[in-house]
Regions:
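Phospho-regulatory, Ser/Thr- and acidic-rich intrinsically disordered linkers and terminal tails
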Residues: 1-185
Length: 185
């Protein structure tokens, strides 16, 4: 701003359109609220912790009572300054459902989580830096139908770490791959 004032005082001209666009840099402030329900098992809890470790732009909140209305998620997201929400709902201590929602008035999707394997039991001994960003890779099946295109966009907004995230490191050292097989992601 001071450089623009010096230019204006020296040249007597106003700031150019390029200077105006420099001041209006669009910031990607995507934040994801991770929220488990009551009654999740230890394996499900470890899955939530693994996803939290993968997403440096996420905020984890305490467990939510599953009997409550799901519209509470919008209020919790707003209180935590998050515009995306991942809610892990456990039913009968067996089934795990993942709600993806773009809060407050965006689309939402309910996914059933099958075959849970945590990073500890798979012995992932890679050298990924904690908080580093990742590349998202999508199968070309996501371009086949409109509902898959919507899922691709939702997954991109949930898992893409913004460059300006608070805890994100400036390195890219791993890839998250999403593919469709037998109608499942």
């Amino acid at each position: 701003y001071s450089a623009a004032l010096k230019r204006e005082a020296a040249g007597g001209q106003k700031r150019s359109a390029a200077d105006d666009q420099d001041t209006k840099i669009r910031r990607n402030k995507q934040r994801v609220l991770l929220l488990p329900s009551r009654g999740i098992t230890t394996r499900m809890r470890h899955l939530v912790n693994d996803i939290e470790a993968l997403l440096p732009h996420s905020k984890k909140d305490s467990k939510l009572d599953s009997k409550s209305d799901l519209s509470v998620l919008n209020e919790l997201s707003e209180l935590n300054n998050c515009n995306n929400c991942m809610y892990f709902e456990a039913r009968r201590h067996e089934d795990l459902y993942l709600w993806l929602s773009k809060t407050p008035n965006g689309p939402s999707a309910k996914l059933q989580v099958q075959n849970i394997h945590t990073m500890d039991e798979l012995k992932m001994t890679g050298n990924c830096l904690k908080g580093s960003r990742h590349i998202l890779s999508f199968d070309k099946g996501f371009d086949a139908a409109p509902h898959w295109q919507l899922m691709r966009e939702m997954l991109t907004q949930m898992f893409a770490v913004p460059r300006t995230a608070r805890r994100a490191k400036p390195f890219i050292d791993h890839v998250l791959s999403f593919s469709i097989l037998d109608g499942k992601i």
